[in-house]
Regions:
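Short, surface-exposed binding/anchoring microloops in extracellular/periplasmic proteins
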Residues: 15
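Helix N-cap/beta->alpha junction signal
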Residues: 18-19
């Protein structure tokens, strides 16, 4: 009789970004931290913007069809979350990560030790100028995120 090979089940994680730039950043971070290190399958998606409630509804549709152990939403804070949004996220067992100030780009500028402009658009322009390509490509993040920055995040 042949031996059965036991399949190790991995926990699953869905990380959803507000838009294409957030998705590219999350995929870049996934490549650094999740590559064979964790016993976890990480899926990345983009909610394609909108209000926080629209993004929460988008994720609710996804997890209605596919079950994940953990679900995380990375969203900008330029449009504030309401109590209703937070309750809906809690009901879906959705963890919210709010990028402050204003957006992911502002948060990254702050982490890089650079001055943070006063508006979302200015933050995006300041960071996108430092990228090696379009902000929607995970390869573009490598130029401005040095080893020093990566080690400070760990």
């Amino acid at each position: 009789m042949a031996r059965r090979i036991r399949k190790v089940l991995k926990t699953t994680l869905l990380v959803v970004g507000e838009g294409a730039a957030e998705k590219a950043f999350i995929e870049h971070m996934k490549g650094i931290y999740a590559a064979g290190v964790f016993d976890q399958k990480v899926s990345v998606d983009a909610a394609d913007g909108g209000s926080p409630s629209a993004m929460i509804r988008y994720i609710a549709r996804i997890i209605g069809h596919v079950s994940y152990d953990r679900t995380v939403l990375l969203l900008d804070t330029d449009i504030p979350n309401t109590t209703r949004d937070r309750k809906a996220a809690k009901k879906q067992k959705l963890e919210l990560i709010e990028a402050t100030p204003w957006c992911l780009e502002g948060m990254l500028l702050e982490v890089l030790g650079q001055p943070t402009p006063a508006t979302t658009k200015a933050c995006k322009n300041a960071l996108h100028a430092q990228l090696s390509g379009p902000e929607t490509s995970k390869q573009s993040c490598k130029r401005c995120m040095s080893e020093t920055w990566k080690s400070s995040i760990r």
